[in-house]
Amino acid sequence: MVIDTSALVAMLNDEPEAQRFEIAVAADHVWLMSTASYPEMATVIETRFGEPGGREPKVSGQPLLYKGDDFACIDIRAVLAG
């Protein structure tokens, strides 16, 4: 499946279609995005939430879902401990 920015934004904002999109994504084993979607996503996030929405994840108070040790020394709560 190729995932468009519009679907990602809908899921991130918990828009009415979000659950349908999340179910579709979970049911597929291949997730692709256009390279153009990455800067487009950043633009949409900054437009909707201002600069802190795209550059200061700590502002939201939400935990960070990540893989690896790249964020071990930051003061943002992890979704998955250890």
UniProtKB/Swiss-Prot annotation:
Binding residue positions for Mg(2+): 4
Gene3D superfamilies: 5'-nuclease (3.40.50.1010)
Pfam name, any one: PIN
Keyword line: Hydrolase, Magnesium, Metal-binding, Nuclease, Toxin-antitoxin system
Keyword Lipid biosynthesis: no
The keyword Magnesium is annotated on this UniProt entry: yes
Protein origin, superkingdom: Bacteria
An annotated Gene Ontology molecular function: nuclease activity
Required co-factors: Mg(2+)
EC number of this enzyme: 3.1.-.-
Family stated for the protein in its record: Belongs to the PINc/VapC protein family.
Main function: Toxic component of a possible type II toxin-antitoxin (TA) system. A putative RNase. Its cognate antitoxin is VapB34.
Protein name: Putative ribonuclease VapC34
Organism: Mycobacterium tuberculosis (strain CDC 1551 / Oshkosh)
